[in-house]
Regions:
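Conserved N-terminal segment of class I S-adenosyl-L-methionine
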Residues: 1-116
Length: 116
């Protein structure tokens, strides 16, 4: 299990770094936000993967049985990783409507993402 989530995180980093965010129809705010994350994306993905692993270990359920709520989801990268790692249901919540639009676009580009 640990290897799968960490492997998914590494693969996702490659996918996300390959995206030209400046060409996407997303807000300037989100372009700046993601541009600041991009150089340290591997670092954050490792943290996200570790959080998912610790959560799964403490709950003791299989990933497919879990609902993860990404409250204040920002870039949505945690939501994408959770879904890619096999979490059953992923709910993304952010008060910024531009961030919600961005995660919808990213979900199409990487072929996975939050359910809501």
């Amino acid at each position: 299990m640990k290897y799968d989530i960490r492997q998914a995180a590494q693969a996702l980093v490659s996918q996300l770094k390959a995206i030209d965010y400046e060409r996407l129809p997303i807000s300037k705010y989100n372009k700046r936000y993601i541009a600041r994350l991009k150089p340290v994306l591997s670092y954050y993905m490792k943290i996200y993967a570790d959080c998912i692993l610790k959560g799964l270990e403490s709950i003791g359920s299989s990933p497919e049985e879990i609902t993860l709520i990404d409250y204040g989801g920002g870039s949505g990268f945690l939501s994408i990783l959770a879904k890619q790692a096999g979490i059953g249901r992923v709910i993304y919540i952010d008060l910024n409507p531009d961030s919600v639009d961005t995660i919808r676009i990213l979900k199409e580009l990487v072929n996975t993402g939050p359910d809501i």
